[in-house]
């Protein structure tokens, strides 16, 4: 009751006999990563030969069983040109696909994987494709208002609001029972369900209590930034990339926020111009 359960899985080990069970438990969502519609690119990223065909087949079986599925397509240098095809595939199946074009550092604070992160120039090309093909992203982004408009009415309330849902409305549980705040934050263990109840962890973990104290006021620079609404601020991104410093503001995140704002304005002007010419 009052609990939504989602599963994050590559689905390569999904068995046919498990599908009725997944349907019976009434999952909120199964999310899986599909990095490209090119099998070679997908398998190169996963380092598992044949994983593309297995994941794709599993997605289609789940869709056929009317189990909610969402495709995640994190972008990096190896698959930066393939999101549009993944999105079209998802649209064909009538399911949602989303991308993350800012690669996150590893949960163990190792940043060596960021060599594969998209440059600002590559991110711009990807964002232009997203504005063109991803209707949901387009609708959400084009309806954003400058944050100043919202803040001037009740800035005090805004500053007291949490940065995200971490510690408030979501957590993750691994197969070994470890509980952590959100996907990508595996090293920040809150407790273990084999040693204590989830209720006890959620209500009494000192780490959860600490996360709940973090609000928009903890980031004064962000609170006054004109690109605030176009920024995907994320505690775990900062934590992983900045040697465990939740309050760090890596420059790349800020650059992408301003890029997103600029492209949104350009695209909006393009739409308005087309409407006037019609």
Where are the predicted features?
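Flexible mid-to-C-terminal extensions adjoining Fe-S/redox cofactors in radical SAM and related proteins
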Residues: 179, 184-278
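Glycine/Thr-rich phosphate-binding loops of Rossmann-like dinucleotide-binding domains
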Residues: 15, 40, 235
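Short, conserved alpha-helical segments within structured domains
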Residues: 14, 78-82, 218
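Short hydrophobic segments within beta-strands
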Residues: 8, 72-74, 225
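Radical SAM enzyme [4Fe-4S]-AdoMet core and its adjacent flexible, acidic
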Residues: 20-29, 33-176, 184-193
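Conserved Radical SAM active-site core
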Residues: 1-8, 12-28
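Flexible, active-site-proximal loop/turn residues at the rims of small-molecule/cofactor binding pockets
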Residues: 13, 36, 103, 231, ...
